[in-house]
């Protein structure tokens, strides 16, 4: 809607979600030939832990080459791959040589790899943080690594501690397969901060529907709905509500998000950089108790959600 307002004469090409989803499934099938430990990051991105696969398929670099080759043969698409000791370094490496690159960060060479890169390459260092760091004389990741972590924490708060660890190549997060995840979430980061409450609400509703659709696909209804808000100054808050029963109904998730939005952001004047919606507390959707009216409503939700899912996959 915003793009149309800014560029009323632009030609907009409708997305083909069903095609994207099918190609994503093909690529995911290639990943799972080499490891069951696959954590989707987006339709076209994922983290793979191939630690236990080396005896069968060779070292990580060889597995990466094979995956690139098989994706090209089966989908006619190129892929950029980063091979590294942890998730942060692997993601950074994969971004350095798009669209058809292969970057290997050897164990023990993290410092040499990171040293010359601009500090903006670190997750969470946006324009404002980069400006603060630049005023401190910090231009590269190497510059950042040489700054005392305590001083960074004074300047940037807990965010400073986090980026200090990343600057030293430290990232302890495990690769979490989708089926083992304790929550389902979607979030979006805006190129420009969003200030209008109605625009924030529209984004949260869209994210809630994405989460509900994914939960239905995974057959993982949940009781706890959460919103995540990152403001322009990188302060991040989360707010959650626990429902009476587990659900993956789009209507119920939208209602929960509306409630959380009204409580925290309905009158917000602060610009927002990121919004997210999550679902957790997985249980049995059939555990819902209620009268005939609630069961009729549940049946209607199921029908509507089926229509929504088919429409989402089609368009």
Annotated model-derived regions:
Residues 1-162, 175, 213, 296-315:
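Gly/Gly-Pro- and Ser/Thr-rich, intrinsically disordered tail segments characteristic of DNA damage-repair
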Residues 41-45, 84-87, 220-224, 270-274:
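Short Gly/Ser/Thr- and Asp/Glu-enriched loop/turn motifs at secondary-structure junctions
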Residues 46-52, 238-241, 288-294:
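Short, hydrophobic beta-strand segments
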Residues 51, 84-86, 230, 278-282:
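Short loop/turn motifs enriched for small/polar and acidic residues
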Residues 112, 186, 283:
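Surface-exposed, charge/polar-rich loops and edge strands
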Residues 121, 129-272:
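DNA-contacting surface of Y-family translesion DNA polymerases
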Residues 245-315:
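Acidic, metal-coordinating catalytic segment for phosphate/diphosphate chemistry
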């Amino acid at each position: 809607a915003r793009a149309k307002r800014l560029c009323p004469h632009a030609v907009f090409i409708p997305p083909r979600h069903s095609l994207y989803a099918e190609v994503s499934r093909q690529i995911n099938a290639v990943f799972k030939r080499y490891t069951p430990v696959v954590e989707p990051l987006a339709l076209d991105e994922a983290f793979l832990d191939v630690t236990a696969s080396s005896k069968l398929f060779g070292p990580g670099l060889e597995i990466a080459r094979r995956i690139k080759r098989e994706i090209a043969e089966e989908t006619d698409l190129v892929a950029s791959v980063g091979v590294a000791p942890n998730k942060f370094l692997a993601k950074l490496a994969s971004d350095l040589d798009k669209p058809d690159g292969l970057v290997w960060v050897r164990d023990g060479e993290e410092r040499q790899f990171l040293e010359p890169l601009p500090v903006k390459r670190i997750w969470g260092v946006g324009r404002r943080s980069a400006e603060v760091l630049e005023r401190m004389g910090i231009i590269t990741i190497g510059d950042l690594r040489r700054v005392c972590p305590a001083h960074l924490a004074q300047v940037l708060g807990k965010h400073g501690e986090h980026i200090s660890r990343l600057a030293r190549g430290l990232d302890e997060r495990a690769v979490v397969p989708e089926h083992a995840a304790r929550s389902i979430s979607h979030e979006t980061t805006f190129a420009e901060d969003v200030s209008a409450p109605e625009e924030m609400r529209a984004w949260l509703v869209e994210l809630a529907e994405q989460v509900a659709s994914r939960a239905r696909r995974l057959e993982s209804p949940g009781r706890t709905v959460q919103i995540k808000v990152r403001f322009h100054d990188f302060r991040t808050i989360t707010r959650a509500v626990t429902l009476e029963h587990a659900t993956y109904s789009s209507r119920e998730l939208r209602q929960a998000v509306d409630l959380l939005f009204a409580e925290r952001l309905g009158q917000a004047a602060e610009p927002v950089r990121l919004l997210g919606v999550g679902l957790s507390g997985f249980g049995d959707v059939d555990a819902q108790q209620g009268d005939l009216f609630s069961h009729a409503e549940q049946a209607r939700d199921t029908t509507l959600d089926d229509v929504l899912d088919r429409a989402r996959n089609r368009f």
